[in-house]
A protein has these predicted regions:
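Histidine-centered divalent metal-coordination motifs
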Residues: 101, 105
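Active-site scaffold of zinc-dependent metalloenzymes
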Residues: 50-93, 106-110
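Surface-exposed beta-strand edges and their flanking turn/coil or helix-capping segments
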Residues: 16-20, 83-87, 121-123
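Auxiliary, metal-adjacent structural segments of Zn-dependent hydrolase domains
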Residues: 12-72
């Protein structure tokens, strides 16, 4: 599995944790090692409409996708549900939690549980 992380001003330890999280989550979600070797994950950290989103890459096969883009808006993760400002490890845990959630969607795309329909709708 190839994992590329595009980010600025993110600590190296968090990037390493994100890379490890991808391998651990894909294997624990029941994706075989043979299939996992062919996966390409590109993680973009920056401003986005929501905290996280997982998509099939534009040039990937729509019916058997192997290339995915994951968008994480780490700026929205600074404040929790109670309007507390998250600092240090709390913020890192929130980023990893959101990444894990988006990796579940990647698993759904791979297994065909989530697929593209007409006009870009997901079903």
């Amino acid at each position: 599995m190839k994992v590329k992380i595009h980010s600025k001003h993110i600590p190296f330890k968090l990037k390493a944790a994100m890379h490890s999280m991808c391998g651990y989550a894909i294997s624990s979600l029941g994706i075989s090692d043979r299939l996992a070797k062919n996966l390409n994950l590109t993680i973009h950290m920056g401003h986005h409409e929501c905290e996280g989103e997982a998509r099939v890459a534009k040039d990937s096969n729509r019916y058997r996708p192997r290339d995915f883009k994951i968008y994480l808006d780490h700026h929205r993760m600074d404040v929790d549900d109670y309007n507390r400002t998250l600092e240090g490890t709390e913020w890192g845990h929130r980023v990893l939690k959101t990444l894990a959630h988006e990796l579940v969607h990647v698993k759904q795309y791979i297994r065909g549980e989530l697929s593209w329909r007409d006009a870009g709708l997901l079903w």
